[in-house]
Amino acid sequence: GGGRYRDEYASYPVIMLDFTAAASRDGAGAAAAIRGAVVRECARLLPLLAAPDLSRREVRLIERAARGVASDKEIDAALGVLIKLLQAAFDEQVVLLIDDYDAVCPKRLDAKDDGSVDSLESLSRMLFDTIADAGDSLRLTCLMCERPGHAEFALSQRGVSYRSATALSSWCDRWFGFSDDEVQVLLDCIGRNGCLDDAREWLEGYLLGGFYCSSPERVVAPTSVNGWRSILTERAEGPSPIMMSS
């Protein structure tokens, strides 16, 4: 399937949200870009929700989002529903990766939703409410950002434990380690066979091609390689953590 990987260790469904497109926008434009990222993940992962025992009402919500006919309210609910459906479909916890979250951080995460806050602030609260409510449904949540302070505040307000990590930390390597064989398969797909060392560093959260890149799809997706599946392979047992990578 398009969002799952299996090897001798373990495998988990992966949701990847890239908010980079929202970085240059404000207010409603940024909120639309965030919802667009959720819609694209609904479309990408919809084929994995074919199990007959899943809630048809919830699957229809994801279908509406994937077709681009869902309301903003439905899209805002889609992430939590997607986590629930993926866990039920594969009987596994879900991995949630969010890239460039801080590019659209609202100014007041502690503001009350009394009509005075804009849609971006409401979306931010919705995102962290979803993470908190998902609980044990999430194996790992990784918020990749330059300024983790907003995420730390939001998580602490909800009583959610987290751990900050730099890209070079051994803790990050433990969760995001890839075998040389896995790295070589990706390189073969994109015609970079001789770049094993560089690619290995990138896949553990470093650099590839001289620029920072934290989402595998940014390198692989443009080649439309059918063999690539969104992947996070875990080699260590432990609690479900939240990580902010700076």
Feature roles, as predicted:
Residues 151-160, 165-230:
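Amphipathic alpha-helical segments of the small helical/lid subdomains adjacent to P-loop NTPase cores
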Residues 20-24, 102-103, 146-153, 232-235:
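Conserved nucleotide-binding/hydrolysis micro-motifs of P-loop NTPases
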Residues 42, 78-90, 116-139:
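Substrate-engagement module of ASCE P-loop NTPases
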Residues 1-48:
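P-loop NTPase motor core
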Residues 10-14, 137-139, 162-170:
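Short glycine-/polar-rich loops that comprise or flank the Walker A/P-loop
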Residues 65-83:
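Short glycine-rich substrate-engagement loop in P-loop NTPases that contacts/grips substrate
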Residues 95-99, 126, 139-146:
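Structural recognition of the conserved hydrophobic beta-strand(s) that form the central parallel beta-sheet
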Residues 90-117:
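Conserved P-loop NTPase "ATPase switch" module shared by AAA+ and STAND
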